[in-house]
Amino acid sequence: HQINVFRTYVGGGFGGKSDPFPHEMCAAILARKAGRPVRITFDREEVYWINRGRHPSRIEMNLHADSEGRISGIETDALIDGGAFASFGHVTTYYNGVLHTAPYEIGAFHYTGARVWTNKPASGAMRGHGAVNSRCAVETGLDDLAEQLSVDPITLRLANLLPPHSATITGFRVTSIGMRECLERVKEASGWNDKFRKMPLGKGIGIGCGFFISGSGLPIHWDPNKFPHATVHLKIDMDGGVTIHTGAADIGQGSDTVVAQSVAEVLGLPLDMIRVRSQETDTSPVDLGSYS
């Protein structure tokens, strides 16, 4: 190996560190040529040039429901603006579809999506990419449906929530789900019945639902080869302790601590005999990334 990358504790995810950026490569190449450390800094305007923003989206959606508001199907066509470089465009297009329907129980779902190249800064994995825009489309669509059916928007959502221990139509497993209790408490605490459609011109009250998925134990590449998302190597030390080599980057989620605790529990060792090395690529096995 000619290059050994040392990872520092920079903190924070939110998609901003998911892409490899040209200036990172430039800094490494310049450092090798100069034999000195190289640092690249940007002013705020330059940050917008080189970083990644959210994908502007045009989403067309048809909701199918009976007279009582039970949703039988959703048809969605999404077109997203990925800018001039690929970045996470294909992944965001995929997420727009698979994250589209939760937390609702949908009878049928059809999705088409496309990412277009434009002469603009690239869009990427910015804060829940692929979920935020589609959630906006679904929630505003539900409001329109409630208006057409003369149904209360909260009542409509309560009628279509997924039950616990079920699955979304796109294949995500649902264990516990507190959305019903949450909506009922919000309705009561907000004074919904006294405010909805009863506030003066220019003021109003609305509702929208969101959700998140936990990817722990789920490889990002869903393929038949079943490759692991992460691997660790354990080395038994002379003092009886264990050194863990992992490529998982601790960006605040506590992976260094959790890995150490897991190994300590399985091997029956005290935590102070566990050492974690996750800072350099020479000694760390492959890990597909830590991101929010």
Describe each region flagged by the PLM.
Residues 1-292:
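Structural alpha/beta core scaffold segments of enzyme domains
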